[in-house]
From Swiss-Prot:
GO terms for cellular component: cytoplasm; nucleus. Residues 38-132 bind DNA. Coiled coil: none annotated. Transcriptional regulator that specifically binds DNA sequence 5'-AGAAnnTTCT-3' known as heat shock promoter elements (HSE). The hydrophobic-rich region (HR-A/B) corresponds to the oligomerization domain. A motif (Nuclear localization signal) lies at residues 202-208. The gene is HSFB3. A motif (Nuclear export signal) lies at residues 236-243. Residues 216-244 are annotated as: Disordered. It is found in: Cytoplasm; Nucleus. This is Heat stress transcription factor B-3. Homotrimer.
Amino acid sequence: MEDAGEHLRCNDNVNDEERLPLEFMIGNSTSTAELQPPPPFLVKTYKVVEDPTTDGVISWNEYGTGFVVWQPAEFARDLLPTLFKHCNFSSFVRQLNTYGFRKVTTIRWEFSNEMFRKGQRELMSNIRRRKSQHWSHNKSNHQVVPTTTMVNQEGHQRIGIDHHHEDQQSSATSSSFVYTALLDENKCLKNENELLSCELGKTKKKCKQLMELVERYRGEDEDATDESDDEEDEGLKLFGVKLE
């Protein structure tokens, strides 16, 4: 009996010793996962949102829980090429969707993700790209089955075509939003151009009036100088007789 008890105690000790490395390994794996860097797309996006020099185009919202693209046209034209080597705003929006961002409101381009916060850059490591849903594949050549196949042999619902239509609808919606934003931007530029033209016309008119006033005073001064010269030529007279 004592041998059996000692054997059980030995087994307990062994289990305790084995348990410690296991917990340690779990802890290490968690730490390693936490140290994984965020995707480059998120790093670049966070950087441009954080940059105070671009606040007129893109910046955090008032609470720091999301960011707003204030000027989509300028953002696509000036900033996107320096960040992602393209100028397609719709593509940028689709990328945000794949990382779980959502459009907060319909009145402006505001996007939010609970792991994308002002002053909490480390949270981005928890954001991962959504895995696209796999379509059915041909067993012989592993090519994608045409999307006209609506239902599989077991009667399950279609799995690929819905996702494809959602992507197309999202792309079309983003394109329409971009088109509307560009129209609004163009309208604002036209209004500003008309205002500047009006101000320029007023400035030219004032400048012309000023030049006319200067010319008039210059002419009066020349006339006064000529009269003074004539009086000096007449000399001094006494009872109408010129004194020598």
